[in-house]
Amino acid sequence: MNNKNKITHTFQSEVKELLHLMIHSLYSNKEIFLRELISNASDAIEKIRFEKLYSLKKYRENLYTPKIKISIKKDEKKIIISDNGIGMTYKEVIKNLGTIAKSGTKSFLNKIQNIEKKEKNDFIGQFGVGFYSSFIVSNSVSVYTRHAKEKKNIGTLWISEGKGKYSVEKISKEEHGTIVELSLKSSEKEFLEIWKIKNIIKKYSDHISIPIEIENYDEKTKTISWEKINKAQALWTINKNNITKKKYQDFYKYLTNDSEKPLLWSHNKVEGTQEYINLLYIPKKATWDIWHQENKHGLKLYVKHVFIMDEATQFLPNYLRFVKGIIDSQDLPLNISREILQDSSITHILRKSLTKRILNILNNLSENNIKKYQKFWNVFGIIIKEGIAEDSENKTILSNLLRFSSIKKGNIEQTLSLNEYIKNMKKNQKKIYFITSDSYKSALNSPNLEIFKENDIDVLILSEKIDEWMMNYLTEFNNIKFQSVSKLDDTIDSLLLKKNVSNEKNTFNEFIEKTKKILKNKVKDVKITYRLKNTPAIVLTDTNDMSTQMAKIFSAAGQPIPKIKYILEINPLHPLIKKIEKIKNEKDFSNWIKIIFDQSILSEKGSLENPHKFIQRINNFFIS
């Protein structure tokens, strides 16, 4: 070491701010400094691997064994991380360690951007930022480095306490690569324990493809040995043809802490503009917190086999939050801490691709393994329904995944697909009919279904809270429109078998006009209908008005509800209506009409604005 060569520099102002931020607030988990340094060492080795491919005269495969080594010096309170990667020149040290985001990786990629080889995307990150995390646990950091293209013994030493200045000097270093020496703070003694370092490496860097070795010193024999800590090959990087079913299942359990086997999984390697590997699992059961909006649900993110974060939500839409697994990107951009993904175009591409992959997997399952898909739907169907509103781009395939109960199915289990419904439609049926209600039983007994049952027309039954909201976005399927049986539908008459119907429309004109005058602004309209059999009247909402179920959803959420004016449809063939039609006393006629209207409202909404008045009218008829 020649002190005459030592030159002191001041950090770039942004670096000073970064150091202060990192040391005092940025990283909540101090141990990730080791992850960052190992990641940087891995980057440096990947770079020299590239040089071996394109400068074969200088670097020979059989003369180079990549390695990352870690030594702990308890007495000196030091951790030393070394690699035999590409290293840095004197100028690169000043450029990369004195400024932000100029680690050499970005410049290196710019240099090779015209090379038509996939290896050019084989480097990650911004070295400088991660390197600064060393100061979270260190009083001082020393970096010894020599670039692989420099002559032997021409190296550089960089030293800083992270307080605004750093020194650089030329030194003699025989091997290319970098040694990072951390002088730990007195409060960070835990990182001097070998078991602690091993656990951190297994947690964050177990899947680094380069062997990571730790130094063991035997006090008795006074000998040093090196122990490999990481597996050095991630499961998802292995050819899927060489992975057993049990290995996939065991990895899922390790990944999720789920005691059960997954329902299914998908393992793919994608090469092209973006290169990444994904290993995705669909569980058999939902997690306890799947409805907790404050909890994040996402994939484990790796970049070049380096663990970056849990619950990376950027890669899947919220309605696929039940999916577990990993994504391992070769060139994904990261932000300053590596813990929050940049909202980049690459992220959007990966999200789009992964979403389509999962939906296609589910669609294939629904077509080829109905029993297994039904198990999936019974657990996660209600979450898939969210996608209809959230993901217009994939609405078609999402619609294929939907399952319903119906009046013909005769049970609450949702097993009917829309394709099956359409296949069984009547010849003259032009719409897909559905009903929404608070419960399956309530929907099944709705008077709105009477004429459909009589005419053997199936109706989808939707009784989950999300259904009404979903149907506002699901307006058609395969060019066939959906029609709520609780809304006005002037085309329904073409489906009905009208028996014993003469000229009621003409003879009931006076009845209709009198009813309109009695109900006044309580109704939007009063009409004759033949869709009823055992019920005297029903109320419907107009085509573009808010439905009763949607109003209930708004009310439950504390949202203001617009005044709903119903359309009263009267069954002229019902005995009670015929009896009322003959009443001459205007007061009695009026009371009967109000009772019929309240009954219809009660049947539709399940409640009345003034139930006491309704009961009073009923009682008056009992005693009259």
Curated annotation (Swiss-Prot):
GO cellular component terms, semicolon-separated: cytoplasm
Region labeled B — which residues? 339-552
Segments of this protein annotated with the region A: 1-338
Check the record and name the InterPro entries matching this protein. Answer: HATPase_C_sf (IPR036890), Heat_shock_protein_90_CS (IPR019805), HSP90_C (IPR037196), Hsp90_fam (IPR001404), Hsp90_N (IPR020575), Ribosomal_Su5_D2-typ_SF (IPR020568)
C, as annotated region: 553-624
Taxonomically, the superkingdom here is Bacteria
Pfam families xref list: HATPase_c_3, HSP90
Record-level Gene Ontology MF annotations: ATP binding; ATP hydrolysis activity; ATP-dependent protein folding chaperone; unfolded protein binding
Q: What keywords are annotated for this sequence in UniProt?
A: ATP-binding, Chaperone, Cytoplasm, Nucleotide-binding, Stress response
Name the SUPFAM superfamilies for this protein: ATPase domain of HSP90 chaperone/DNA topoisomerase II/histidine kinase, HSP90 C-terminal domain, Ribosomal protein S5 domain 2-like
Where would you find this protein in the cell? Answer: Cytoplasm
Give the chief site where it resides: cytoplasm
Q: What does this protein do?
A: Molecular chaperone. Has ATPase activity.
What subunit structure does UniProt give? Answer: Homodimer.
**HAMAP family membership:** HSP90 (MF_00505)
Tell me which family the UniProt entry assigns to this protein: Belongs to the heat shock protein 90 family.
Protein name as it appears in the record: Chaperone protein HtpG
